[in-house]
């Protein structure tokens, strides 16, 4: 029978290195036998309930289990973080359903999340690769057209766009600050793409600082959302796990984009 730890070790064989500091078992026992497992972008209450009601033993989450971000590894976390209602609810639900929780973050980005997002957008092979810094060449087109193409690819009816000028600006080299790489805390990633001649970004999640960083470099940014940019890769990862561990019933739970645009 497959254990939680064996699933984690399998991920390490795919990346060729140990899991990252923010990854690993964060609730339950690593020696636990897994007969059913749910994979989700985040261990939201609905995701935990879905795993529990399916009778699963394990919930694999891509994002931080608790707030503030990665608090379980924080050097000086807020003294009362466990009592925060959002954290207490998640903990109590995991306990109620008897679930183990493992976080698999950057490892799955490496394995398939980034490339699946690029494939969803129809970008083909990158023209520059340095780890997860990748640049894609496209036929020259106006930003407005690229926005419409991203809408069609993602199924999102509306997108936030920081155009950095006119929407008729012609672009030809795409960078992908997927997930949270478009946020202000990750502008260093944007700069690495800029250094390779990117002239447009298709991002997961961004914010005003992140948008402004790109705009002041003359680079328009098209935002999808953190979830939308990573869910397809996590669905693919679920299939990979199913093939690697046929004795375990894996299921993907889709965390929807949390916000709505009200016109």
Regions found by a protein language model. Give the residues of each.
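Active-site catalytic microenvironments in core metabolic enzymes, especially phosphate/sugar-handling
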Residues: 1-263
């Amino acid at each position: 029978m497959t254990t939680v730890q064996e699933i984690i070790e399998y991920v390490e064989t795919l990346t060729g290195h140990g899991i990252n500091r923010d990854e690993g078992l964060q609730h339950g026992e690593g020696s636990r036998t897994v007969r059913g497992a749910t994979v989700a972008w985040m261990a939201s209450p609905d995701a935990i309930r879905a795993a529990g009601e399916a009778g699963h033993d394990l919930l694999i989450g891509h994002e931080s289990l608790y707030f503030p971000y990665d608090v379980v590894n924080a050097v000086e976390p807020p003294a009362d973080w466990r009592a925060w209602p959002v954290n207490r609810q998640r903990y109590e639900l995991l306990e109620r359903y008897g679930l183990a929780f493992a976080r698999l973050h950057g490892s799955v980005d490496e394995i398939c999340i980034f490339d699946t997002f690029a494939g969803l957008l129809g970008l083909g092979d990158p023209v520059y690769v340095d780890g997860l810094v990748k640049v894609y060449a496209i036929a020259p087109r106006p930003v407005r057209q690229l926005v419409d193409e991203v809408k069609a690819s993602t199924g999102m009816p509306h997108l936030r766009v920081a155009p950095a000028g006119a929407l008729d600006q012609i672009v030809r080299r795409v960078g992908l600050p997927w997930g949270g790489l478009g946020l202000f805390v990750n502008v260093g990633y944007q700069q690495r793409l800029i250094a390779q001649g990117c002239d447009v970004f298709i991002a997961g999640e961004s914010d005003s600082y992140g948008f402004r960083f790109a705009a002041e470099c003359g680079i328009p940014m098209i935002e999808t959302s953190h979830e939308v940019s990573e869910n397809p890769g996590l669905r693919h990862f679920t299939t990979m796990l199913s093939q690697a561990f046929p004795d375990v019933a894996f299921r993907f739970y889709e965390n929807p984009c949390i916000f709505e645009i009200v016109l």
